Amino acid sequence: MSFLLHQSRFFTTVNHLRDLPATSQPEICFAGRSNAGKSTAINILCNQKRLAFASKTPGRTQHINYFSVGKADEPTAHLVDLPGYGYAEVPGAAKAHWEALLSTYLQTRSQLRGMILMMDSRRPLTDLDRRMIEWFAPTGKPIHTLLTKCDKLTRQESVNALRATQKGLAEYRTAGYQGELTAQLFSALKRVGIDEAHELIESWLIPSDKGETDAAQ
């Protein structure tokens, strides 16, 4: 099966809000704690080994990486790799810069269609994961959680982790969050949930009504 995400390449790096590219294509951002497997997940979803890089020192990378999707000269969309969060050794000034950059990007970027939030399936919905959800909540845009590294859990533990996450996300709906909140199990090592994630991401990037119009032509 061919996926749009397989046509991905590095586009640019952003260190400050003023450097955000003046692009019009839809964007999907990838967020998650340091060591949650974000870079690995991006690479396997894009069918590449070294598209997204994990810092040798977790949490040290404090910039945003853009990847274009589709034709090189006429991208269909962009994937946006946000800095990993939650690593204790990051200096206070770097944390403050990261928080300002991410919260403003998440709340004001009009091109952003949704967030893919990576959580280690063994430790889902940490306080910092919840902060990411709460930063994004005012936009009303969808959040899809990938519970990574589920290969490290038994089948029953995986089911329990997914149920616990879905229950936690349901609390935001009860509190009035308007965006769609979904979750799935994911393992890059065992290739669990890859097709499911592909289909959801591409449905955000290419709305079904456009696909139906193209098919009719």
From Swiss-Prot:
HAMAP family: GTPase_EngB. Residues 24-207 form the EngB-type G domain. The gene is engB. GTP binds at residues 32-39, 59-63, 81-84, 148-151, 185-188. Necessary for normal cell division and for the maintenance of normal septation. This is Probable GTP-binding protein EngB. The keyword Nucleotide-binding applies. It comes from Paraburkholderia phytofirmans (strain DSM 17436 / LMG 22146 / PsJN). Keywords: Cell cycle, Cell division, GTP-binding, Magnesium, Metal-binding, Nucleotide-binding, Septation. One of its GO terms (molecular function) is GTP binding. Transmembrane segments: none annotated. Belongs to the TRAFAC class TrmE-Era-EngA-EngB-Septin-like GTPase superfamily. EngB GTPase family. It comes from the Bacteria. Mg(2+) binds at S39, T61. Pfam families: MMR_HSR1. One of its GO terms (biological process) is division septum assembly. GO terms for cellular component: cytosol. Its cofactor is Mg(2+).
